Amino acid sequence: MNKLIRMVPGVLAVVAGVPALAGEKIQLIEHADTDATLDLGAKGDSVGDLLTFANPVYDAANKTQVGSDQGYCVRVIAGKSWECFWTLRLKDGQITIEGPFYDAGDSVMAVTGGTGKYAGAKGSMKLHSRDAKGSSYDLTYELL
């Protein structure tokens, strides 16, 4: 029993060490097909409005659908930014995201966790609009 107790901390150190995904970069393209804005604040674009979505996600070549994402954003600064929470669903697991989404320019959000292959994931995700309409986005996940 004493040997088992001494072994467990070593095993925990290996399990809690650097994940196998460290340094992995995932490049995807989201098609913003279902984005819907709910006008919950003052009439028009205002603090408190809600943006919801459940969109297909494609490989970096924009040819094959490899998953989907779904989530919501709350308007925090009218005409400027949202605070978002969403889940990317891929074949081998999920990655959760949280952070600001800016109306203009790129956004960088935190990877806050995951499931399956991505269990314990952390890092960042850069979001870049591919066009002025916001109909598709480059998503670059950098896992630590």
Where on the chain are the PLM-derived regions?
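Bacterial N-terminal signal peptides that target proteins for export
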Residues: 1-8
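Targeting-peptide/extracellular-domain and disordered-appendage signature
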Residues: 4, 21-144
